UniProtKB/Swiss-Prot annotation:
Biological function: DNA-dependent RNA polymerase catalyzes the transcription of DNA into RNA using the four ribonucleoside triphosphates as substrates.
InterPro entries tied to this protein: DNA-dir_RNA_pol_insert (IPR011262), DNA-dir_RNA_pol_RpoA/D/Rpb3 (IPR011263), DNA-dir_RpoA (IPR011773), RBP11-like (IPR036603), RNAP_asu_C (IPR011260), RNApol_insert_sf (IPR036643)
Keyword Ribosomal protein: no
Catalysed reactions, as listed in the record: RNA(n) + a ribonucleoside 5'-triphosphate = RNA(n+1) + diphosphate
Primary enzyme class: transferase
EC number(s) from the headed UniProt entry: 2.7.7.6
Gene name, Swiss-Prot/TrEMBL: rpoA
SMART domains: RPOLD
Protein name per its UniProtKB record: DNA-directed RNA polymerase subunit alpha
């Protein structure tokens, strides 16, 4: 055997401890792989195995879940809790509506629910309620397929049409897996004793076989990991950095301000050719310019103010790297 190849399980044993519980033993694994795969399988088994659950109930004469029914020993809250314990299987449909009608004194069980050929009630002996003398119950129960846990409040927020007056939305626990644990023991192959044996202990509600649940979880993991096996790097299109937007007026030459010849010449001597150059200068800086006095300064300030500009303004990234291109674009005056 190549030292670079990984061991895969040669022995897989299934011990059915009851119709609902089984132990699955797999060995050998390379050291550490038992924990890696055991934890992954456990998480998928608890969260991602599809199942069925009651999601809504409408009871004749009941407006909300805090009501009571004359002749019924349980209040509606207790009845709903008992109803959640009913285990069902939908063979083809994704949802269906079942009827529950009984008007005789005694125990109401899951077997009293009227079901079609598409629906299988796994625990028909499960107790839902107790009818006393003169009591009766008539209800419509919506059953759906799903995964994981779905609080009723989430569904009512997503779709207001799901319920009307008298409809009671139920918190739905779809997972058919009640409990999963795993242990790791030492395994041996020939002279190697540093190997793992993975033992998974799983209990379901009876709507799915424990062994089939493990197979389904394994297929989910294989499907998810297959993406990584075919992983190829893909170059995402990158946007070229764009220069920050610049007010077009700042790109215009100072000649467009129509200053006096004296003021315009003084600015050009200081290499102030664009309005963007000018507004970043302070009054003190301009007054140090040869031949530019207070009168010319006031003229410049008034012209800038008429364009909602002023001296001493700060501009980021000025001058722009491609200033000449900006000036040549349509709509920009050239100097």
């Amino acid at each position: 055997m190549s030292s670079n190849s990984f061991l895969t399980p040669r022995i897989i044993e299934v011990h059915n401890l009851s119709p609902l519980r089984a132990k699955v033993v797999m060995e050998p694994f390379e050291r550490g792989f038992g924990y890696t795969l055991g934890n992954a399988l456990r998480r998928v088994l608890l969260s991602s195995i599809p199942g069925c659950a009651p999601t809504k109930i409408s009871i004749s004469g009941v407006v909300h879940e805090y009501s009571t029914i004359d002749g019924l020993q349980e209040d509606i809250v207790d009845l709903i809790l008992n109803l959640k314990g009913v285990v069902l299987k939908l063979h083809s449909k994704n949802s269906t509506v079942l009827s529950l009608k009984k008007d005789t004194e005694g125990i109401v069980t899951a077997g009293d629910i009227e079901s079609s050929h598409d629906v299988e009630i796994v625990n028909p002996e499960h107790v839902i309620a107790h009818i006393t003398s003169g009591g009766r119950i008539e209800a419509q129960i919506t059953v759906e397929k799903g995964r994981g846990y779905l609080p009723s409040v989430n569904r009512s927020r997503e779709d207001k049409s799901l319920s009307s007056i008298g409809d009671i939305l139920l918190d739905a626990s779809f997972s058919p897996v009640r409990r999963v644990s795993y242990t790791i023991e030492n395994a041996r192959v020939e002279q190697r004793t540093d190997l793992d044996k993975l033992i998974i202990d799983i209990e379901t509600n009876g709507s799915v076989d424990p062994e089939e649940a493990i197979r389904y979880a394994a297929r989910v993991l294989v499907e998810q990991f297959s993406f990584f096996a075919d992983l190829e790097s893909t170059l995402l299109p990158t946007e070229q950095p764009r220069a920050p937007a610049i007010d077009p007026i700042l790109l215009r030459p100072v000649d467009d301000l129509e200053l006096t010849v004296r003021s315009a010449n003084c600015l050009k001597v200081e290499n102030i050719f664009y309005i963007g150059d000018l507004i970043q200068r302070t009054e003190a800086e301009l007054l140090r310019t040869p031949n530019l006095g207070r009168k010319s300064l006031n003229e410049i300030k008034e012209v800038l103010a008429s364009r909602d500009l002023s001296l001493g303004m700060k501009l980021e990234n000025w001058p722009p790297a491609n200033l000449e291109n900006y000036v040549k674009e349509p709509g920009h005056a050239s100097s």
